[in-house]
């Protein structure tokens, strides 16, 4: 009789464990990339003339463009100046979550679209490299609410918080920083526009 009772208890416990495991597996895990998807990421000085803008999707893939307008670089063939341009795609992956507001993100792949120099409507378009992002780089992602005191002066410049009338104590937007490239992308909802 004891053997039957033990078997029943074992079967009951096994069934409960399997149900709990199934329930845990059924819960969708939200990746940090799910949160970043649907934002416009912009790296710019705020003064205009140049920017790198990209979109990051939920699977970690991304695409973007870089442009730098040099209206003083002109000639008879292109009297309205020169624009350096680049379109690119790539893939990122999560290295690790550092704390509740910080993640390390690696740029696993970066490809630029092959284009040729051309003159169109008085402007010379020159192929360039993506500015601010590079393959193999490990970038640091900061969530809104991160104290601005953790940032270097260069990082603060790229967050654009110092341009606000009253410098906030915490980030209001997402911020993706690269020490290697000395760059910082601010994440904005796509509906409100990219540049500050």
Predicted regions and their residues:
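N-terminal glycine/threonine-rich, aromatic-flanked beta-hairpin/loop signature
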Residues: 48-117
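Long, charged/polar, surface-exposed segments that mediate recognition or autoinhibition
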Residues: 97-146
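Edge beta-strand at a domain terminus
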Residues: 84-97, 133-196
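Tryptophan-anchored aromatic micro-motifs
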Residues: 28-53, 172-196
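Short, solvent-exposed secondary-structure boundary motifs
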Residues: 39-48, 81-85, 129-131
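Sec-dependent N-terminal signal peptides of Gram-positive bacterial secreted proteins and lipoproteins
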Residues: 4-27
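Generic recognition of cysteine residues
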Residues: 21-24, 44, 74, 86
């Amino acid at each position: 009789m004891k053997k039957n009772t033990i078997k029943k208890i074992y079967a009951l416990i096994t069934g409960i464990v399997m149900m709990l495991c199934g329930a845990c597996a059924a819960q969708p895990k939200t990746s940090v990339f799910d949160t970043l998807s649907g934002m416009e990421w912009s790296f710019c000085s705020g003064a205009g003339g140049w920017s790198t803008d990209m979109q990051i999707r939920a699977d970690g893939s991304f695409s973007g463009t870089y442009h730098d307008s040099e209206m003083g670089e002109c000639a008879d063939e292109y009297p309205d100046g020169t624009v350096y341009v680049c379109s690119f795609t790539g893939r990122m992956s999560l290295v690790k979550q550092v704390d509740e507001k910080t993640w390390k993100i690696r740029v696993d792949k970066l490809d630029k679209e092959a284009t040729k120099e051309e003159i169109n409507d008085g402007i010379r378009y020159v192929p360039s490299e993506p500015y601010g992002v590079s393959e193999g780089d490990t970038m640091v992602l900061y969530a809104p609410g991160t104290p601005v005191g953790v940032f270097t002066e260069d990082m603060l410049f790229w967050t654009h918080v110092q341009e606000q009338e009253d410098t906030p104590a915490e980030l209001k937007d997402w911020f993706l920083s690269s020490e290697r490239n000395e760059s910082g992308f601010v994440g904005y909802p796509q509906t409100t526009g990219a540049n500050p």
